[in-house]
Curated annotation (Swiss-Prot):
Cofactor note as given: Binds 1 pyruvoyl group covalently per subunit.
Subunit structure: Heterooctamer of four alpha and four beta subunits.
Record's subcellular location: Cytoplasm
Protein name: Aspartate 1-decarboxylase
Biological process annotations from GO: alanine biosynthetic process; pantothenate biosynthetic process
InterPro entries, per the entry: Asp_de-COase-like_dom_sf, Asp_decarbox
Keywords from the UniProt entry: Autocatalytic cleavage, Cytoplasm, Decarboxylase, Lyase, Pantothenate biosynthesis, Pyruvate, Schiff base, Zymogen
Modified residues (Pyruvic acid (Ser)): 25
């Protein structure tokens, strides 16, 4: 049996831009992509903390160190600049792999710089 497990998460990223006229996707600072083991063109889920919207799209790498988090195309209708979002990637794995799997979670500050790296999510609330 295979399970779909969270593999990486950018927690509380700040949307820096919403570009309705670009062809779909989310542009993410390449340093952030690397930090949580995501890949260009990988499918991700995005959860908007401000309005509850959830959507799926794919990653386009943005300039390293820029802090860019830009929702493109139709996704731009579901966010506004300054919104806090959670960006999640998932992997399929066997029960055996899942038993020892530790996702990479980056908690970001308001400038989309990594404040803290976590493995398994803590049992406490992170604000």
């Amino acid at each position: 049996m295979y399970r779909t497990m969270m593999s990486g998460k950018l927690h509380r990223a700040t949307v820096t831009e919403a570009n309705l006229n670009y062809v779909g996707s989310i542009t993410i600072d390449e340093d952030l992509i690397d930090a949580v083991g995501m890949l260009p063109n990988e499918k991700v889920q995005i959860v908007n903390n401000n309005n509850g919207a959830r959507l799926e799209t794919y990653i386009i790498p943005g300039k390293r160190g820029s802090g860019v988090i830009c929702l493109n195309g139709a996704a731009a209708r579901l966010v506004q600049e300054g919104d806090k979002v959670i960006i999640i990637s998932y992997k399929m794995m066997s029960d055996q792999e899942a038993a020892s799997h530790e996702p990479k979670v980056a908690v970001l500050n308001d400038q989309n710089k990594i404040e803290q790296m976590l493995g398994n999510e803590p049992a406490r609330t992170i604000l």
